[in-house]
């Protein structure tokens, strides 16, 4: 059945050997079949193309425009921001490698000038949107992503991977079919008959050993910086989204990069700002870090870039920073809805009067939102939903002042505290600290060095605590529930969720205005008969009553009598360790989480624009014959199917 093909038939299935080039063509066709006529029309319109042939090359500028990372397809990415240009290149190379599916090993032979074709981009989009699971249901997304990011591999890993790959590299491969293909079948029909989930080059990831591969740490930092930037922009008017994203890329990159570095340190705690150009991330570190700490950051943002960007109906307009006021063929009801939306825009704009503080900005909010989502907390955290309740830099560092600012807020809050790590000299000579230490029991002996390799004198330490219940005086009993979560924001990222306990019931917080301070994860302090003693739990954050010192404690090897309100670290390197962060407080802030009304209005605006764009596209691609023409253009039906030869 065609040249260069051999076939065998068994009772269970029909098998045939085909050239790799033909298999890759059929795989691309199968990926194309996951797209709708509307999505095909959108891609064709954005690229101004008349056919979906594999010779069409996507440039770096094209890619940024297609993913809605740039609103101007004529603007060179390097003119936006130097690091942004680097990460677009990282994405470009990653998508090029995914586009080589099912033959990932071909990437080992690729040179530095490999080009991303349109069909390869469509294959990569099937991976990132999850549509590939419709014909390869065992695809491991994180493994595919890691492989794509690890090229070009380091010299050592490249040699190991290439040596193994050369042993299995052939010009043809065997495919299994559900039914015997007919000589008259088109490529589209053949692609549907193939049992892709059984194809060995897919099930073995082309025999690549991911344990030999590495991702440069600085590349990972740049990629996560971009993901956090995209995540920080909530769904709203598309033009407003473009404006905000461009503004944050140009003005806030360094802040988001700092947040990204914390996340990368969750993968590999040995990475820091000074050595990330020489450090690498292994697959084990990547998989563990993403799964335990921020899975949704990758899956949600990449899906958004492809579903709403590459495959979406909206075309960015660099000359229209504000939402368009006109629509095509709008009904009277739609016009009324648009008029109402325009009026709401004035109220929505008020949300952007948000003012940054030392601890809260778009980057830190994106990091907190990532942690809470990873903890299973369904809370919208963005500049549109948070309200500053207390800021020690403005209101003064007084527990009475703090009490007066936060006790009336009857909704969830985020308690943020930051400071400089205490040095040995301060611990030995500061009398106020020594008074606090008299109440706070030591765990480490005076002869021990309690520092871990990842802890340094220069660290800026920042923690955030999500508290769902309203604050109150709790001089006799703790309050809180099992949603209370401690998040380490810097110098590394970590999450400490509340333990499920039918007795404790998550009551892990106390606010004591009688000289015992604030505690998360502690038993009630003792304060009677001239005895003043804090009783820290296995995982706890304790704030001294004068708001001058704080201690985060994580004691894995504590006694059985020590209370456990929070789970241990989610980071592999720290989970079974005993460590503390003792620091002098420089900033303390409490932010209330407010109504999501503005977010809902913004999302409605986004949905309205999507609907209008699809309506306009329906006008342009409205007839059955035109739908068919699009599918023929993509080679999915008609005379473009290369029938007659499998």
Curated annotation (Swiss-Prot):
Q: Where in the cell is it found?
A: Cytoplasm
What keywords tag this UniProt record?
Cytoplasm
Tell me yes or no: is Cell division among this UniProt entry's keywords. Answer: no
Could you tell me which InterPro entries the record lists for this protein?
A: TLDc_dom
The organism's place on the tree of life at top rank: Eukaryota
Q: Which GO terms describe its cellular component?
A: cytoplasm
**Entry keyword annotation includes Transmembrane helix:** no
Which PROSITE patterns would you find in this protein's record?
A: TLDC
Report the protein's function: May be involved in a process influencing telomere capping.
Family the entry assigns? Belongs to the RTC5 family.
Q: What protein does this entry describe?
A: Restriction of telomere capping protein 5
Record the organism.
Clavispora lusitaniae (strain ATCC 42720) (Yeast)
């Amino acid at each position: 059945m065609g040249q260069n093909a051999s076939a065998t038939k068994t009772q269970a299935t029909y098998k045939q050997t085909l050239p790799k080039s033909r298999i890759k063509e059929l795989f691309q066709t199968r990926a194309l079949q996951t797209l709708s006529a509307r999505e095909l029309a959108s891609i064709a319109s954005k690229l101004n193309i008349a056919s979906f042939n594999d010779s069409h090359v996507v440039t770096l500028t094209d890619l940024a425009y297609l993913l809605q990372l740039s609103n101007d397809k004529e603007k060179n990415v390097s003119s936006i921001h130097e690091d942004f240009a680097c990460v677009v290149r990282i994405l470009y190379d990653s998508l090029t490698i995914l586009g080589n599916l099912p033959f990932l090993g071909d990437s080992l032979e690729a040179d530095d000038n490999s080009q991303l074709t349109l069909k390869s981009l469509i294959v990569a989009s099937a991976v990132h949107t999850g549509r590939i699971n419709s014909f390869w249901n065992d695809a491991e997304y994180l493994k595919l992503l890691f492989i794509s990011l690890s090229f070009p591999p380091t010299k050592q890993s490249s040699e190991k991977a290439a040596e193994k790959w050369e042993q299995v590299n052939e010009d043809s491969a065997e495919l299994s079919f559900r039914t015997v293909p007919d000589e008259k079948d088109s490529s589209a029909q053949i692609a549907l008959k193939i049992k892709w989930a059984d194809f060995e080059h897919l099930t073995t990831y082309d025999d690549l050993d991911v344990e030999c591969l590495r991702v440069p740490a600085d590349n990972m930092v740049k990629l996560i910086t971009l993901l956090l930037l995209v995540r920080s922009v909530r769904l709203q008017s598309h033009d407003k989204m473009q404006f905000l994203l461009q503004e944050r890329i140009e003005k806030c990159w360094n802040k988001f990069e700092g947040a990204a570095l914390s996340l990368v340190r969750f993968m590999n705690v040995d990475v820091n700002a000074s050595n990330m150009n020489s450090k690498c991330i292994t697959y084990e570190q990547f998989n563990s870090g993403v799964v335990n700490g921020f899975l949704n950051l990758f899956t949600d943002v990449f899906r958004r870039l492809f579903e709403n960007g590459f495959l979406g109906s909206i075309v960015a307009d660099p000359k229209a920073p504000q939402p368009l006021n006109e629509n095509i063929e709008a009904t009277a009801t739609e016009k009324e809805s648009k008029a109402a939306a325009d009026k709401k825009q004035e109220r929505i704009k008020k949300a952007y009067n948000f003012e940054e503080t030392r601890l809260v900005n778009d980057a830190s909010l994106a990091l907190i939102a990532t942690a809470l989502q990873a903890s299973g907390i369904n809370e919208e955290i963005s500049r549109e939903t948070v309200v500053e309740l207390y800021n020690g830099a403005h209101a003064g560092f007084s527990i009475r002042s703090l009490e007066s600012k936060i006790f009336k807020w009857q909704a969830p809050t985020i308690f943020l505290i930051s400071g400089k790590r205490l040095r040995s000299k301060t611990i030995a000579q500061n009398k106020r600290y020594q008074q606090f230490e008299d109440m706070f029991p030591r765990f480490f002996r005076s002869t021990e060095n309690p520092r871990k390799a990842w802890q340094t004198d220069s660290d800026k330490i920042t923690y955030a605590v999500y508290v769902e219940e309203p604050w109150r005086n709790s001089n006799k009993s703790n309050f809180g529930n099992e949603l209370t979560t401690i998040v380490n924001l810097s110098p590394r990222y970590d999450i400490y969720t509340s333990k499920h306990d039918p007795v404790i019931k998550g009551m892990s917080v106390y606010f004591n205005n009688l000289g015992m301070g604030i505690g998360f994860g502690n038993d009630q302090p003792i304060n009677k008969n001239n005895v003043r003693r804090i009783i820290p739990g296995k995982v706890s954050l304790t704030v001294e009553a004068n708001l001058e010192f704080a201690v985060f404690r994580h004691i894995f090897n504590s006694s059985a009598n020590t209370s456990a309100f929070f789970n241990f670290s989610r980071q592999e390197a720290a989970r079974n360790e005993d460590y503390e962060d003792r620091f002098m407080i420089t900033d303390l802030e409490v932010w209330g989480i407010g109504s999501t009304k503005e977010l809902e209005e913004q999302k409605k605006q986004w949905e309205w624009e999507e609907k209008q764009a699809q309506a306009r596209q329906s006008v342009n691609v409205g007839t059955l014959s035109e739908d068919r023409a699009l599918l023929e253009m993509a080679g999915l039906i008609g005379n473009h199917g290369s029938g007659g030869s499998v």
